[in-house]
């Protein structure tokens, strides 16, 4: 039975899934189509939801994960059966470690064919149970709307994360006659009276306090109020790895990033501070340099997170405040503290170091091969104040991490699980969500080719990111560690690359290859102007192998 032969007044379960996603505010889904969820695809035909057809399930999952960071609604992807689910798994792992709200719908074999090793059969629960918040399989058509509501709630509640929903092919074509389930309210927590008193007392006692912000569970208004409160009290705040922008790059309270690629001073500050207040994050592996920093039990650590389990946390916990960042900030801004010259001096000293560390290199090119520093300097000068940047994993990320001025919450989008192949899909998602904003994508040669095919998606749907591919002919981060542990024994890290500019042109974008530093400013200008005229653009920047940002 298909949707055209159902009794009057009913919808198929597949169509009801779409109606329920609409009711939850979903505006865009990322799909690689499959026969097993054709009825849901048919429901999308008449839907207000935009269907973005991607070229690989990994790209679809990354785009959905990026949407979970860019918006206050879980990102949604749809793939089919075992092969599609396997390819999408990388995006789920990113959502799990990055605490990103995301729902992956997977078309499954017919219900009656289970456990017979049917074509492309797999067991979603055994595959995903350890890396998803919930794994659900639609077992009755009348539960279609209910299961969407449960999935969206599970992805958003507590510590956000990925949810997997299996859609058996024969179940979604059957009639659904019940009502659309409304969104389930998500608890936001908040400071108790004792939380308030203890935090205020700790701040008043501290001489060198530091806020550390992170995670995806903020709102734009909460980020702005948080920045204003910090500035009013002359208090410093540092960013968790790849979470810049929640406190503006130009804020006098912003003192730099912590984690991989961080400046040395922010690592020292973790131990020098007499009070750390983590908001939306915990002192985990990356933030503490492999569980080495801030492990002394005589220091005060306050942790603000809605996750009572404190998953991934290391070191002492003086007090946990169970609250989402936005609710915590609502309470915090009502806390008025007297002026404190010691705080001001502490903050100003850290801010001065940060300004020096992140100051743009010269825009003027020098003699010799193309340089990433020249490219970043010329690019940043062109970008609007609300520009966004996306990147994946590798040596190329260090330039964006250091020099990109993330002025707004969710203006720096990356994979905190260190997943390669993230840069282009996330840039496409960002450009589609914010078509009026500049979107810069920084990719490495190894990382780019893992999902560079999503340039086709950019061309098909009018996304206009500016992509800079840093080509150092190697897997740079791995090579760096290899040289430290096995000096002068190069094995398995070298690359021979195609002409990425010609690839971009073949996909319908603007592409230019640069080998000399003198060519960089004009190439960046041409590429940027191409994005302003409605094309995606790519600059293939061929640099020296052992190039370093710091």
Put a short name on every predicted segment.
Residues 106-146, 243-349, 527:
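Glycine-rich, acidic loop regions that bind phosphate or pyrophosphate groups
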Residues 14-17, 24, 32-35, 40-45, ...:
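Active-site diphosphate/adenylate-binding microenvironment
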Residues 35-111, 114-120, 272-284, 313, 322, 398-475, ...:
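Thiamine diphosphate
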Residues 69, 215-302, 405-437, 449-453, ...:
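Glycine-rich, anion-gripping cofactor-binding loops and their flanking helix/strand elements
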Residues 122, 150, 154-205, 358-359:
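Conformationally flexible catalytic loops at phosphate/diphosphate-handling active centers
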Residues 15-26, 66-72, 96, 154-159, ...:
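Glycine-rich phosphate/diphosphate-binding loops that line cofactor/substrate pockets in enzymes
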Residues 1-8, 178, 197, 201, ...:
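Phosphate/pyrophosphate-binding active-site segments
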